[in-house]
Amino acid sequence: LHKAIRRQRQMCIRDSINADVPKIIPAYNRIRAFEDTCKEHHVPYELNLNVCGDSYQELFSQMKIIFADIDEKYPGQKKGVFLANDTYANMFLNLIFQKYGCLPDTYELVGFDNSPIASEAILPITTIGQQIDVIAHTSMELLVQQMEERKKRKPVPLAEPIHKQITPILIRRETTN
């Protein structure tokens, strides 16, 4: 995210689209990182945390409203939209194509997770990828540490879960310059 925003300082990042998650959940850090990075680089931003639903149709209906709002509020302006996951980014991209028939120069989209839909979309979507190999390796190290601790004569169990942050990577595709 830092790379994407630093690279596009003149670009007006208008929205982070996500569900409103409790601050104690690690996924909240995506929202916090978005805000912190925009503030650090003096980039105006808005958060839209109203996305929730139990079906694709419900989510798509909400995404239509969000897209219409952004499109109406900022005509002719550059709009960078960071979405909570690649599925949301694909929905948003579809809405743009339904209205314009292409991805106008005034829009740039970034998804999150590097899921298959990001590369399979009508235009491959720029995304923030999690380093699954590093996550798996780190998880295994933590598991082995806990197993070794349990072998001790007087094992000391963890007082609370260990949270490790693994640096994600920006995967540039066709929805950003």
Where are these regions (language model features)?
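Short hydrophobic/charged patches on amphipathic alpha-helices used for structural packing
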Residues: 1, 64-67
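Single conserved hydrophobic/aromatic residue that forms the stacking wall/gate
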Residues: 1-13
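Short, cationic motifs built from Arg/Lys/His that form the positively charged side of catalytic pockets
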Residues: 9, 30-31, 146, 173
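Helix N-cap/coil-helix junction residues
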Residues: 10, 43, 101-102
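Structured catalytic/translocation cores of nucleotide/phosphate-coupled proteins
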Residues: 11, 21-23, 156-158
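Hinge/beta->alpha junction and helix N-cap segments in small-molecule ligand-binding domains
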Residues: 17-65, 83-90, 112-114, 129-138, ...
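Flexible loop/turn connectors
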Residues: 68-177
